[in-house]
UniProtKB/Swiss-Prot annotation:
Cellular component, GO, one term: cytoplasm
Main localization, broad class: cytoplasm
InterPro entries in the record: DNA-binding_RecF, DNA-binding_RecF_CS, P-loop_NTPase, RecF/RecN/SMC_N, RecF_2
Amino acids binding ATP: G30, A31, N32, G33, S34, G35, K36, T37
Keywords: ATP-binding, Cytoplasm, DNA damage, DNA repair, DNA replication, DNA-binding, Nucleotide-binding, SOS response
Domain of life of the organism encoding this protein: Bacteria
The protein, known as: DNA replication and repair protein RecF
NCBIfam families, per the entry: recf (TIGR00611)
Function, as annotated: The RecF protein is involved in DNA metabolism; it is required for DNA replication and normal SOS inducibility. RecF binds preferentially to single-stranded, linear DNA. It also seems to bind ATP.
PANTHER family: DNA REPLICATION AND REPAIR PROTEIN RECF
Family the UniProt entry places it in: Belongs to the RecF family.
């Protein structure tokens, strides 16, 4: 998959713009604050219906406009194209259109436009809360296992019912038992999908990381959210009193985590910020390879401030790994000269200069 056309209106400081990007490498360069990251944010909105820069809606919409809109034409892996559009207003109303029809959920966008983000906050995947790593894991499972979304929705519904009962005692014994059975069934299905995904991801991650960084002894493991030697139904029964005291369910897939350890310690406590970023890059590129295999198409990479915290050797290694995916990449940087030697001469590269929210396409820097 790739975006052949992008139209952006009223996203932060960007002037209304229509872009025709390269199906491979796109470099957006300009001074800090010029609007480069806002272009990536607009693409992120189109693919996930949310910003990666803010949980609040107001800062995303240009201060003089009532709503922001992003439109994209996607070239599909199987041939043909699909038109996607998203609009959000200041009241929070969201409109999603796919090929002229209203879409039911953002999951439909995500399925058509798989996006990977690598930015200066990427280290949070290692340092941050388990929720961030679950999101990473479930993004991958969603794109390779079509049954995952249904199981995840069943889990969320069962959890809401059980947690409501824990707080308010609104269910009778039979209803409580029924929801516990549904919770256990969905949990087991999700655990099966996640476990299979991690087994596929680990060798690809290890090979990818070896191209970027030599880290002997780094291990990636999966914790499913409850004792591996006990059934979830048994764990729920034994922790019922504690769950009632807390008002929520402590065990289950909603407590799962990915664990990266080095020399017996949490890797985030040992690795430098630059090393953490390379580990995260390897994880996200490995996910891209699995998407390629499962969907016979590529995800799109949004790479914000690529030179940040990486020396020339590692920048070039990362560029080569992205290039080997044969996917579409959008990269921002202040000085595009730092990326001059990153690509094969036959790889299509489009250059865009961003200044005060205006975007102009410039000549390929290798010509």
């Amino acid at each position: 998959m790739s975006l052949s056309r992008i139209m952006v209106t009223a996203v932060r400081n960007l002037h209304p713009v229509t872009l025709s990007p390269s199906p491979r490498i796109n470099i957006l360069h300009g001074a800090n604050g010029s609007g480069k990251t806002s272009v990536l944010e607009a693409i992120h909105l189109l693919g996930l219906a949310r910003s990666f820069r803010s949980t609040r809606l107001q800062p995303v919409i240009h201060y003089e406009q009532p709503a922001c809109t992003v439109f994209g034409q996607v070239q599909l892996a199987e041939g043909g194209s699909s038109n996607l559009g998203i609009s959000r207003d200041r009241q929070g109303e969201l409109q999603i259109r796919i090929d002229g029809q209203n879409a039911r959920s953002a999951a439909q966008l995500a399925d058509l436009l798989p996006l990977q983000l690598i930015n200066p906050d990427s280290f949070r995947l290692l340092e941050g809360a388990p929720k961030i790593r679950r999101q990473f894991l479930d993004w991958g499972v969603f794109h390779v296992e079509h049954r995952f979304l249904g199981a995840w929705q069943r889990l969320q519904k069962a959890l809401r019912q059980r947690n409501s009962w824990l707080r308010h005692g609104t269910l009778d014994g039979a209803s409580q038992a029924a929801w516990d059975r549904e919770l256990c069934s969905a949990s087991q299905e999700i655990d099966t999908y996640r476990r299979a995904y991690i087994q596929a991801l680990k060798p690809v991650f290890e090979r990818t990381l070896a191209e970027l960084l030599q880290l002997e002894g780094l291990t990636l493991s999966y914790y499913r959210g409850w004792d591996k030697d006990r059934e979830l139904s048994e764990v729920l029964a034994s922790s019922l009193l504690r769950d009632q005291q807390l008002g929520h369910t402590q065990a289950g897939p909603q407590r799962a985590d990915l664990r990266l350890r080095l020399a017996g310690h949490n890797a985030a406590e040992i690795l430098s910020r630059g090393q953490q970023k390379l580990v995260v890059c390897a994880l996200r590129i490995a996910q891209g390879h699995l998407v390629n295999e499962a969907k016979r198409g590529q995800c799109i990479y949004l790479v914000d401030d690529l030179p940040s915290e990486l020396d020339e050797q590692h920048r070039q290694a990362l560029c080569r790994l992205l290039e080997d995916l044969h996917c579409q990449v959008f990269i921002t940087c202040v000085d595009h000269e730092l990326l001059r030697e990153g690509w094969h001469t036959d790889t299509p590269v489009a250059m865009f200069h961003v200044e005060h929210g205006r975007i102009t396409q410039t000549q390929d820097h290798r010509e």
